[in-house]
């Protein structure tokens, strides 16, 4: 997954390019669209420090072809009490898929080439984008657009087989909590956070999500390439969103997973 800021920024860039009517519908349900931008990553944050069926679902979904989720999502939208609300979440998810499927093949290849971890490569890209946008990666709270509520959890939960409304709400709240924990501007807090994650067996994952005080030189090349891929994914996402909103058949793009293949 390109990390939190990249998906957030990407979703805003794509939204600005959509036809007026569709954009207006999504703006009415912007919070759901914004949560959808993080795709199955949302489930990672359910009781994040312990492995469980809900957060493992996030990993499982990343390895599935896009058609698996988006075929199910169509049925969920059709049966939803508020179809526009459900569609807004699904179209945010399309954005996530477009960026992931475009970037992940390169990220995995660069992991093998450089030895830098997957999460660190993506977090370094996040940080590069924030610096480009005049933001401080150490201080900017990247999950400020996530607005947990039971009403939104009721819309989102049906998209995930076997996941309850309570679990979905807990995952949303967990996303906020984890990002607060990882916003380690103070060097002492940073040490405490990373040491605690090492004890919990989550060091590699969490270390990659904590912003480095200085850019990692090994990630300069990857950040430049990922920005190129990001730009190519924008028109792809616009097209896929328009097609999905018009209920057109899923194209060949959905044969790709959210991951490398």
Feature roles, as predicted:
Residues 1-90, 94-261:
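N-terminal leader/auxiliary helical segments
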